[in-house]
Design a protein with these regions (language model features):
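Short acidic/polar active-site loop segments enriched in Thr and Asp
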Residues: 62, 124, 148
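Phosphate/diphosphate ligand-binding glycine-rich loop within oxidoreductases
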Residues: 2-119
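NAD(P)-binding Rossmann-fold cofactor-contacting core
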Residues: 147-167
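Conserved small/polar residues in nucleotide/adenosyl-binding loops
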Residues: 173-180
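Glycine-rich adenosine-cofactor-binding loop
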Residues: 14, 115, 124-143
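Conserved acidic residues
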Residues: 43-45, 156, 177
Length: 181
């Protein structure tokens, strides 16, 4: 008896996901890499998330991407989290390894990898414009990469302060923006 699917299966779970181009892109990337993998786009309402993850685990899916509204709710169903996902409190990718579902957040990783091609962020002082999900992800990854300071500049003081508090609680040094002083 085979405990893995014949083809590796990866999925996207969210609601709404109609029109999401990820399946088109991923299937072509798998093909170009010579991988016999399939990518499924699955419309999963919040009340069915637990069952969908149990199905993902039971059917041996290789992993999945998680989008709204599941990026935070998925955490309670996982076996472990990467450091970045733990700090951000949000997951956008889940990998299944040895029956364990491991959550990751890759939203800020691409930015930092691109930045490192130009300059090493270690020791840099950074200004972050915004405090939403993308800013949160990039700020955490910059902190993990060793920046010396992150100055958060945001339209609303409370949301900016939430990001500053998150970073300070993660032992990263940040400053309020001059506008907030």
């Amino acid at each position: 008896m085979v405990d893995r699917p014949i083809e590796e299966i990866v999925c996207c779970m969210g609601q709404p996901v109609a029109g999401n181009p990820t399946q088109f892109i991923m299937e072509r990337a798998f093909n170009a890499a010579g991988l016999d993998w399939r990518y499924l786009t699955l419309e999963v309402p919040p009340e069915n998330l637990s069952g969908a993850l149990a199905g993902m685990r039971a059917m041996g899916f290789r992993g999945g991407n998680f989008t709204i509204p599941h990026k935070v709710a998925v955490i309670e169903h996982l076996d472990d989290l990467s450091e970045a996902a733990r700090l951000m409190g949000a997951v956008n990718c889940v990998n299944q390894k040895d029956g364990q579902l491991i959550g990751e957040n890759t939203d800020g990783k691409g930015f930092v990898q691109s930045l490192k091609k130009i300059v090493d962020p270690s020791g840099l002082k950074v200004a972050m414009f915004g405090a939403g999900g993308a800013a949160r992800a990039v700020s955490v990854e910059l902190g993990l990469s060793g920046v010396s300071e992150i100055i958060v500049i945001n339209r609303t003081e409370s949301r900016g302060q939430d990001l500053v508090d998150l970073l300070n609680n993660c032992l990263l040094y940040t400053s309020p923006s001059p506008r907030d002083s």
